[in-house]
Amino acid sequence: MHRKKVRQFIVTSSSRNQVNLLVEYLFNGFNPFEFIISSEDVELKKPNPLPYLKAIQLSGINKNNSIVFEDSNPGLISSLAANLPTIFVPSNIPIVLEKNIKLDCILDSLGDENNVANVIKGPKLKKSYVDYSFLSDYLVSFSNAKN
């Protein structure tokens, strides 16, 4: 995504310190994220939509040109209440969704060259992992579903 110049942000209920440590560890000091909205940055946390609305406001991105990757029910409720295209990649299997949550895309993982991502619901993957092409297709299908 970084090579395609896709802007990336983190919206989390975790503390900024926890996220910074994790990003440092996972990316060996390179931080691909423009900014982080952490629990310290908002008065109301997930499942309230405020964290995602703040991220959209700070980024200046059109809601319909963004995609949220979520792994929890409170995050899903938050992103869907903010009317954002959302891909659910659950951290817990089996998947237990709260009632009334309607999703158009669920994956078991994001995958990579060595680990295949499986689409539980949503557009088909062209590769074994989520790539720019998949995200573009998802935005088109999300936009078409809204119209």
Describe the role of every protein-language-model region:
Residues 1-10, 16, 20:
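Short, acidic loop-to-helix structural element flanking the phosphoryl-transfer center
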